[in-house]
Amino acid sequence: YIVKIPEAGKFEFLDSGWMDEVTKGRLRGELSDKQYAERIESIKRFERQLTDNGYLVLKLFFQIGKKEQKKRLEELEGNKDTAWRVGENDWWQNKHYDKCEEVFDKYLTDTNASVAPWYIIDSGDKKWAELQVLETLCSGIHVAMQNESLAVPILQNVFPLVKMPKLSEVELDREISEEEYKKELRHLQKKL
């Protein structure tokens, strides 16, 4: 999933990354419990190696409600310029939303660690989601820059979990006015 690790001071953004393979494998019944556990341990080990070597790992999960997801899929599919972005898998996930949420919840819980935490982004409102992402990036970078050591000691494969809400508990009805959005966006862009 990472062809080349970025050099110091550079960013790498992954869309889905190794999460996609594991969650789709579970949803399709292609990964046994043993294979799933092995993949989870491999992911945690890799993320720990990155953080041990001074990399900042921030994982964002964009949570959206079933109705809003369906609405956006219909809008994308209804536009000839964006229709290509919607596939059978997208509609399958919307139809089986609860099952998908359960699999994603387990994956997020199993791969959430203090060295590489998950941040659940309420994506019901696109502008609100954008601000949450910027705030998360700013906070993560700020904390990382305060850390005087580039590497943290290895703690014998202990991956403490960070408290995280269940996906079904995330508020998905937040909205922000255009004026508030622009003000907060300017603030976060300066901060970043």
State each model region's role.
Residues 1-191:
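Glycine-rich phosphate-binding loop of ATP-dependent small-molecule kinases
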